[in-house]
């Protein structure tokens, strides 16, 4: 039964305080009626005896202390779910904003999700093809994995996210259902329009469910957007048996919104002013990826965050790295050389890659080829350091070959067009083509049988 109160005790930023509350519970949804006409929604974020602190999703502008009616709804925040959500666009709390009418469904789910029994989790296997060689070949995205992209201000992470949405698939041989849930937090209007236009023009909107929290939307809404997106993803994966890729951008906006709300509540700050529970808040989002026993679907996460001042030790990427299973790092130097996508493969890592590639998944040479490309590209750095001291002309013939390999690797393997969609076979074949620039005896990370089979014959001659 809903309980209604008249008046508020105080309004502080995105928060309101209500006293004399009875039978309320944490995370309970609240409805406000301001001046008998404007409706707003919120949720209880703190209870202290008979006092409740409530986050207001639409902001606290025009809320009167005397003439605001507050109704406790007696339930946690829920989002309406349906397979018909694919092809639709919603705001940060799951309300349609695409002029296609309301969502007709009686199914609702708690946005906090249900805890997954660890015993029922299945180990992530198989891969998701993004069509981008630096990811598919060297930091392969595995179904059920959480693999963040570490970017920086001004780097093309929005273009990369849009390209992945356009190209992502389960591979050429799979006939399983695949869809994408896209959540954007704190994005500008032009960026939101870019995503909409890109998805529409490339004909992928029908299998994308998009949640948009714009830069001028209430800060509090940013804290809900990833939870709403993941709730829909879990429904599609575990109840509709679909493989879902969740792309969340920008998790830095989420963390900054958390810091702002924490400051409004007067909490003691931790590192860089962020609350001490930033780690647990990030974990409640990232840990919702996975595969559940008995369900044919999976939830794979590809969160994107911008590192303040390109600092990978900043609390947001630092704590993210503790929770997730690797990272893909975008590099400003590569971007300055017009390499797109500017993925620095050496600090990038996919910890679950070994379990979803190779024979039966991609190709038997995949792991060894990736190891050799990593090792050879690392030697490129050594050769460049030596050339900066003694000059390129004084290098040995082998070092010059490594410099040539490095240039070709960055321009042809890492670099590719925004519309270029490579299959996993094309990515692996390109890797062998580039390794052919090096002498065969330099390929010390690959078994001889694989070299005999895949190493280009013309190079041996």
Predicted segments, located by residue:
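Acidic-enriched and Gly/Ser
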Residues: 1-5, 10-130
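Short glycine/serine/threonine-biased micro-segments
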Residues: 11, 90-92, 129, 135, ...
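P-loop NTPase catalytic core
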Residues: 137-460
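P-loop NTPase nucleotide-binding/switch module
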Residues: 68-70, 77, 84, 96-146, ...
